[in-house]
């Protein structure tokens, strides 16, 4: 078991990192442009989820999966907006309150107020969030896990108070700035990660985003983009045929775009495509497509076994890991270069066993 070090943030102007690594793991872009191993992805996280006692009541919300399982493969960048903005621990509880116009909307912002005192933290929190997110951009995050229901960090359905009524219509002030400034970044709440499909999708997006950023922050060329896209074809197809087709057209017409427009558009559509959760039906279609490359190489009995496993997954009888393991076995056995290089076969560390549950 790798050694984990836990560093408590003391200066909000310096990104503080908890480093958690596992030997011999790397997300690799195996082409002529990026052949080095990538470091464990850096993930922003609400500090209380790591077990730090920074909650308003002096407690924490340690998440076992994030700390003990996922944490072995990533580098955490912990943030507690409420502590870092100067509220202290323990502290008065805060909540979101609708503006005088009524239910919040884009034109009707909410305020962040102390529950008892009514102290208004809105301006300070918004300014802090803008500054802190600028800092976070410099550490090249690959994802972010936010604390659900938090008036600062909640991503969706945060309680908003208005004239004695409460609606689940808000978003934390820090979370709002984060997703506005980093629109392609994989962001999720810890509560939703209890759903196996959402968990697998988030982790998949984290590692894909890291590979994507490694490409476009380097000295990329249209040729390297074509190679990158080719390796991700099946993975993209498993999420959305429409997104897959749109990216294919973009890559085919690279000469029509400036480098900046090509980079911005490809990254936006790539991440939007992966954000659509893959279904058993989509996975089954992709694996059937892959079998087309194998049909002349494997024996009838092996083909029937693989087809049966794919159909069982489509019907919800077996998890994705069953047909994927069989498919990966035949791809490696016959050394099929195109399929062997597909990120779809192993989009995240196998040790996480995420495909055992979807």
Regions found by a protein language model. Give the residues of each.
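Glycine-rich anion/phosphate-binding loops
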Residues: 117-136
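Short catalytic helix/loop segments, enriched in acidic residues and glycine
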Residues: 59-76
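Short beta-strand segments
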Residues: 46-47, 80, 145-149
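Short, surface-exposed acidic-centric catalytic microdomains
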Residues: 80-108
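Short polybasic linear motifs
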Residues: 1-4, 14-16, 21
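Acidic, Ser/Pro/Thr-rich low-complexity regulatory regions
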Residues: 187-358
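Internal, conserved structured core segments that host functional sites
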Residues: 132-216
